[in-house]
Amino acid sequence: MVGWLKGLIVYKLQRGNRSQITLNCNGVGYEVQITQREWLTLENDQTIQLWIHQSISADNWQFFGFKSTQERDIFRELISVNGVGPQAGMALMQECKSQELVEAISNGDLRRLCKAQGIGKRTAERLAVELRASIAAFAGMDPAPSLAEGVSSEQMPESGADVEATLSMLGYDDLEVRRAIRAIAEGSDGPPPPGDDQDAWLRGCLQWLSRDSA
């Protein structure tokens, strides 16, 4: 496996959403895909070194290059999630710098994640759920609290389980439900309803969810 390359840039290419360079490493040319942000800073005849993720399939070998081991490791975390292939991973790396991406995943910022090409809401939710702890840990951050943590018992509706069950029956998944309850508890639409007003909590959550999906 190739883990690191140092060489002279002999060719730069952009094809669609892919940004690629060809590195001359001791007489061997390696085609390496990088983010467009990095591609724009490079020139032909420039010597660079990159940490490499090597993707091997039955009919194709691909190299993805990164300036640091941290960037490469974040990329590897991303593509470990079902439905996130190398191109989607690169789109996420292009949309956000490393720290921004870690924070978006750790904080469940689905809107930011969905700005990356090819990342829909369901995929963003999987990223937030599956990587929240691991991506924060290896990037040197404390994991953010889960999306429902930090809501006091006084803020939660007394029939919170019923609210969650009703929203689940309406087709909302666990992450969406927890985000909605936390948003209402934190007063995103004004003071939270009384704890015993199940209908008001349900209406508030539904209104928040409808805006969030817009």
From Swiss-Prot:
This is Holliday junction branch migration complex subunit RuvA. Residues 68-146 are annotated as: Domain II. Residues 147-154 are annotated as: Flexible linker. Belongs to the RuvA family. Residues 1-67 are annotated as: Domain I. Homotetramer. Forms an RuvA(8)-RuvB(12)-Holliday junction (HJ) complex. HJ DNA is sandwiched between 2 RuvA tetramers; dsDNA enters through RuvA and exits via RuvB. An RuvB hexamer assembles on each DNA strand where it exits the tetramer. Each RuvB hexamer is contacted by two RuvA subunits (via domain III) on 2 adjacent RuvB subunits; this complex drives branch migration. In the full resolvosome a probable DNA-RuvA(4)-RuvB(12)-RuvC(2) complex forms which resolves the HJ. It comes from Synechococcus sp. (strain CC9605). Keywords: Cytoplasm, DNA damage, DNA recombination, DNA repair, DNA-binding. NCBIfam families: ruvA (TIGR00084). GO terms for biological process: DNA recombination; DNA repair. The gene is ruvA. GO terms for cellular component: cytoplasm; Holliday junction helicase complex; Holliday junction resolvase complex. Its main location: cytoplasm. It is found in: Cytoplasm. Disulfide bonds: none annotated. Has three domains with a flexible linker between the domains II and III and assumes an 'L' shape. Domain III is highly mobile and contacts RuvB. The RuvA-RuvB-RuvC complex processes Holliday junction (HJ) DNA during genetic recombination and DNA repair, while the RuvA-RuvB complex plays an important role in the rescue of blocked DNA replication forks via replication fork reversal (RFR). RuvA specifically binds to HJ cruciform DNA, conferring on it an open structure. The RuvB hexamer acts as an ATP-dependent pump, pulling dsDNA into and through the RuvAB complex. HJ branch migration allows RuvC to scan DNA until it finds its consensus sequence, where it cleaves and resolves the cruciform DNA.
